[in-house]
């Protein structure tokens, strides 16, 4: 949440331009290394209730099919660094399962995707609860777009288990067409004169993804 969010402003440290230490909804500083804006304390019962009420409203008011949660690795109060933030965290699993249960209570067939990228045991625990996990296959598709066979294996997209949701590009992993133009493997992909060839190669990528 940003500083304009009312619950952030209720308890605000103006001199530091961030949430105050007595703010029950937010951490002063995120305990994990991936924070954007102000970090919710998902262990707090008020925050938990607030999130659940919002999920319920969105499902009922807009009849959403489900949700994709960004940075669910950060749904924790456990202090971590980049070296251990992905380690198994039972408290984070409990929080996410609680939100998932609240969603299913409103809409049994809701589809929920997590951008998680954590320990395999943790992801398997979440998958066993019916949650789906984001899987990054951007590098392989970029290699293919540029014309390189090395590291262009798409098998990460196709798992026997339905829990993983692979993606070719996202809001974080993008610029495939730029890489194709900047570092092509073949002359037939170089320059403005070969735009049609590059677009055909990208179309093949899309066909494999779909």
Where are these regions (language model features)?
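Substrate-binding/active-site clefts of carbohydrate-active enzymes
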Residues: 1-63, 68-88, 99-105
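Active-site-proximal flexible loops/turns
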Residues: 4-5, 77-78, 122, 176-179
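Active-site-proximal helices and loops of the catalytic beta/alpha 8
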Residues: 12, 32, 71-167, 207-208
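Short, low-complexity, polar/charged sequence segments that are solvent-exposed and flexible
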Residues: 15, 131-134, 184-189
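Generic secondary-structure boundary/loop-capping signal
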Residues: 22-23, 37-39, 123, 164-165, ...
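Non-catalytic scaffold segments within catalytic domains of secreted glycoside hydrolases
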Residues: 34-38, 81-94, 179-199
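A structural signal for well-ordered alpha-helical segments within the folded catalytic domains
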Residues: 45, 49-56, 90-97, 162, ...
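Active-site-proximal substrate-binding groove within the catalytic cores of carbohydrate-active enzymes
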Residues: 100, 149-210
